[in-house]
Amino acid sequence: MNIHEYQGKELLRQYGVAVPNGKVAFSVDEAVEAAKELGSNVCVVKAQIHAGGRGKAGGVKVAKNLDEVRTYADEILGKTLVTHQTGPEGKEVKRLLIEEGCDIQKEYYVGLVLDRATSRVVMMASEEGGTEIEEVAEKTPEKIFKEIIDPVVGLQGFQARRLAFNINIPKELVGQAVKFMLGLYKVFVEKDCSIAEINPLVTTGDGKVMALDAKLNFDSNALYRQKAILEFRDLDEEDPKEIEASKYDLSYISLDGNIGCMVNGAGLAMATMDIIKHYNGEPANFLDVGGGATAEKVTEAFKIILSDESVKGIFVNIFGGIMKCDVIAEGVIQATKEVGLSIPLVVRLEGTNVDLGKKKLEESGLNITAADSMADGAQKIVSLVK
């Protein structure tokens, strides 16, 4: 789950991580009032959307008086920002962060991620702040320093100090930087983050170390124990189809293709998308119905897939282990009748009760194309949607 920058900074502040003073605004008048309350000579007006690259897209403006705050707020609110992370459709700005300006001396990068290679949380830091860390990794990887964190003892002070010295934090500010990193790590662990990025971390003219931007993502599987984080959820920033899918414990991610996929198991779902691509098709979604799908779940899955107008055909690829193929067949039949399916449907079943499942599909009298294998199914659906 993603949250907005201002929410991330609010959370960081609770853990003693230094951030600039700021206020959220949902209207132009609120933005001006927020700037008045901050009382800063310079304010930054920042669009709040779940995507990076806002500055380049015109979503971050520096205002030197209240008139400029009003002008920029009016300009940004309601605007659709298109960045490298939003896709061509962009995201509409519905809220702003009005933040006090600061005298930036130097920009750095600090981030925490899960490293699959070591199965550990890793803190990364670089003195190349303010730019995409992926770009730094590609062009100058020697400028990125890492500390692998032992989960038993957590991030240690000496590790934070080593990072601070490696990225050339001024010696007199190393203590602040260490406190910052330790606080950030505490947030990451205690709040079940999957990513915590501060880009840029800055040193200021008045001798402070603070987060100028904050990106915190959270493990959705841990939200049951993170009620406070769940309250930060902004449904306006999420795909309506993904929201609907979550109500039925379906894992759904929208893609750009025209072949709807309904599969059980994340691995099989990814393999299904791969094989569709292999046969020159384009998947319209990732949809994992899970191991305990019912006829109701399958019906809802069909409805969600069909709510995407770009879908021209559906490929159902099920391996019945925990889930029985006859139950899936019943769900497919029920869903096909209920939604009045008018586009091609290819079904591949394998596993528990597969013969019974295939028999039910054959006897349904519906226009369902059976597939003998995953490759056969992919070829059939690709040819049917052309």
Curated annotation (Swiss-Prot):
<dbReference type="InterPro" id="IPR005811">
    <property type="entry name" value="SUCC_ACL_C"/>
</dbReference>
<comment type="pathway">
    <text>Carbohydrate metabolism; tricarboxylic acid cycle; succinate from succinyl-CoA (ligase route): step 1/1.</text>
</comment>
<dbReference type="GO" id="GO:0042709">
    <property type="term" value="C:succinate-CoA ligase complex"/>
</dbReference>
<dbReference type="InterPro" id="IPR017866">
    <property type="entry name" value="Succ-CoA_synthase_bsu_CS"/>
</dbReference>
<dbReference type="InterPro" id="IPR013650">
    <property type="entry name" value="ATP-grasp_succ-CoA_synth-type"/>
</dbReference>
<feature type="binding site">
    <location>
        <begin position="321"/>
        <end position="323"/>
    </location>
    <ligand>
        <name>substrate</name>
    </ligand>
</feature>
<dbReference type="GO" id="GO:0000287">
    <property type="term" value="F:magnesium ion binding"/>
</dbReference>
<dbReference type="InterPro" id="IPR005809">
    <property type="entry name" value="Succ_CoA_ligase-like_bsu"/>
</dbReference>
<dbReference type="GO" id="GO:0006099">
    <property type="term" value="P:tricarboxylic acid cycle"/>
</dbReference>
<dbReference type="GO" id="GO:0005524">
    <property type="term" value="F:ATP binding"/>
</dbReference>
<comment type="subunit">
    <text>Heterotetramer of two alpha and two beta subunits.</text>
</comment>
<keyword id="KW-0460">Magnesium</keyword>
<comment type="function">
    <text>Succinyl-CoA synthetase functions in the citric acid cycle (TCA), coupling the hydrolysis of succinyl-CoA to the synthesis of either ATP or GTP and thus represents the only step of substrate-level phosphorylation in the TCA. The beta subunit provides nucleotide specificity of the enzyme and binds the substrate succinate, while the binding sites for coenzyme A and phosphate are found in the alpha subunit.</text>
</comment>
<dbReference type="GO" id="GO:0006104">
    <property type="term" value="P:succinyl-CoA metabolic process"/>
</dbReference>
<dbReference type="InterPro" id="IPR011761">
    <property type="entry name" value="ATP-grasp"/>
</dbReference>
<keyword id="KW-0816">Tricarboxylic acid cycle</keyword>
<dbReference type="Pfam" id="PF08442">
    <property type="entry name" value="ATP-grasp_2"/>
</dbReference>
<dbReference type="Pfam" id="PF00549">
    <property type="entry name" value="Ligase_CoA"/>
</dbReference>
<feature type="binding site">
    <location>
        <position position="99"/>
    </location>
    <ligand>
        <name>ATP</name>
    </ligand>
</feature>
<dbReference type="GO" id="GO:0004775">
    <property type="term" value="F:succinate-CoA ligase (ADP-forming) activity"/>
</dbReference>
<keyword id="KW-0479">Metal-binding</keyword>
<keyword id="KW-0547">Nucleotide-binding</keyword>
<dbReference type="GO" id="GO:0004776">
    <property type="term" value="F:succinate-CoA ligase (GDP-forming) activity"/>
</dbReference>
<feature type="binding site">
    <location>
        <position position="213"/>
    </location>
    <ligand>
        <name>Mg(2+)</name>
    </ligand>
</feature>
<feature type="binding site">
    <location>
        <position position="264"/>
    </location>
    <ligand>
        <name>substrate</name>
    </ligand>
</feature>
<dbReference type="InterPro" id="IPR016102">
    <property type="entry name" value="Succinyl-CoA_synth-like"/>
</dbReference>
<dbReference type="GO" id="GO:0005829">
    <property type="term" value="C:cytosol"/>
</dbReference>
<feature type="binding site">
    <location>
        <begin position="53"/>
        <end position="55"/>
    </location>
    <ligand>
        <name>ATP</name>
    </ligand>
</feature>
<feature type="domain" description="ATP-grasp">
    <location>
        <begin position="9"/>
        <end position="244"/>
    </location>
</feature>
<dbReference type="InterPro" id="IPR013815">
    <property type="entry name" value="ATP_grasp_subdomain_1"/>
</dbReference>
<feature type="binding site">
    <location>
        <position position="199"/>
    </location>
    <ligand>
        <name>Mg(2+)</name>
    </ligand>
</feature>
<keyword id="KW-0436">Ligase</keyword>
<feature type="binding site">
    <location>
        <position position="46"/>
    </location>
    <ligand>
        <name>ATP</name>
    </ligand>
</feature>
<comment type="similarity">
    <text>Belongs to the succinate/malate CoA ligase beta subunit family.</text>
</comment>
<keyword id="KW-0067">ATP-binding</keyword>
<feature type="binding site">
    <location>
        <position position="102"/>
    </location>
    <ligand>
        <name>ATP</name>
    </ligand>
</feature>
<feature type="binding site">
    <location>
        <position position="107"/>
    </location>
    <ligand>
        <name>ATP</name>
    </ligand>
</feature>
<protein>
    <recommendedName>
        <fullName>Succinate--CoA ligase [ADP-forming] subunit beta</fullName>
        <ecNumber>6.2.1.5</ecNumber>
    </recommendedName>
</protein>
